[in-house]
Structures are given as structure tokens and as C-alpha cells.
């Protein structure tokens, strides 16, 4: 079974979002990631080993550790804050 972990920063940023529609969209994408962990775009260079999924206007960053059968949700940030 797939193990799910959330970083505290990730949860804080989701709590700050006031828009219900956006929260629902994020929830759907998190479910999608859990079902298909390799759905996100693989990152390169300093972010190697992580993946990102674009949820307008945010990017959801996560790590899929295939050997450990684990997903770690790392961050949710505005696309202009890269």
C-alpha cells in the first residue's frame, strides 16, 4: 500500500487558501497523484527526484519514492514565486 506524507509547510499553505473552488481542485489533483504517482512533470537539476503538477495559478511539488512506495507532498507555491 502507498504511504502518504505531508510536509507542514504544504498543509499550512492549503489552509491559507480561501477559495473553495481552488481547494477542491487541489484536492482532486492530490487524489490523482495518489492514484497515478508519476503523473507530474519530473524536475531536473537541484530539484531532481521531485515532480510538479500545475494547478492554476499554483504548482504542487511532491516526491514519489518508488523504492519505498511513498509519496511526500512537499510544497504548494504560486507559479511566479519560483
Walk through the language-model features, giving the residues of each:
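Basic, amphipathic "hinge/linker" alpha-helix immediately C-terminal to the N-terminal HTH DNA-binding motif
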Residues: 6-10
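Alpha-helical elements of the RecA-like P-loop NTPase motor core of helicases
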Residues: 12, 24, 41
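A short, surface-exposed loop/turn module that caps and links secondary-structure elements
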Residues: 30-54
Amino acid at each position: 500500500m502507498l504511504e502518504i506524507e505531508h510536509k507542514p509547510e504544504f498543509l499550512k499553505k492549503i489552509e491559507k487558501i480561501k477559495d473553495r473552488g481552488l481547494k477542491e481542485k487541489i484536492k482532486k489533483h492530490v487524489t490523482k497523484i495518489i492514484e497515478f504517482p508519476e503523473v507530474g512533470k519530473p524536475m531536473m537539476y537541484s530539484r531532481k527526484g521531485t515532480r510538479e503538477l500545475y494547478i492554476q495559478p499554483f504548482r504542487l511539488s511532491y516526491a514519489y519514492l518508488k523504492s519505498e512506495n511513498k509519496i511526500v507532498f512537499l510544497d504548494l507555491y504560486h507559479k511566479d514565486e519560483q
